[in-house]
């Protein structure tokens, strides 16, 4: 539920019935989950866990996170990466009106190819795998591990002007984030993007 533009209503409480609570970790300016709250949140039985900040959002299977201990560190890394994307695009991070990127894995990728979207669903997962509640999936460890998400984000946000440019320039946000924000040397960041 979002408050309309220029309204100052702030957060509101709503009541829902007949729902199952899902784990939620929030690093939003107005709603930060504490470490103690996370210990309770991660045990909620909903099938998907939500991680959200002012710059990034993702949903992952609850089986990945019921023993996950580092949500704040993870979300700080994602925020740093999203700041890099915004900087590269020439947008001040504070001027974004929505999360820069929203990710979610799925069982099947439609049409067998990657694509842009909100959420971006470019990662597969196997629901029957025993993740022991502390998955080592890259989404929970290293926001720069997979270039695909940044490549598709580039398609969504960059305007290409020249023939052949479309599949090249979209790789630059990933190289920028890895080099400038995460300290990977430029040649490696560029080669792996």
Q: Where do the protein language model's features map onto the residues?
A:
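Catalytic cores of extracellular degradative/oxidative enzymes
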Residues: 37-40, 47-193
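Extended acidic/polar, glycine-enriched regions
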Residues: 1-45, 50
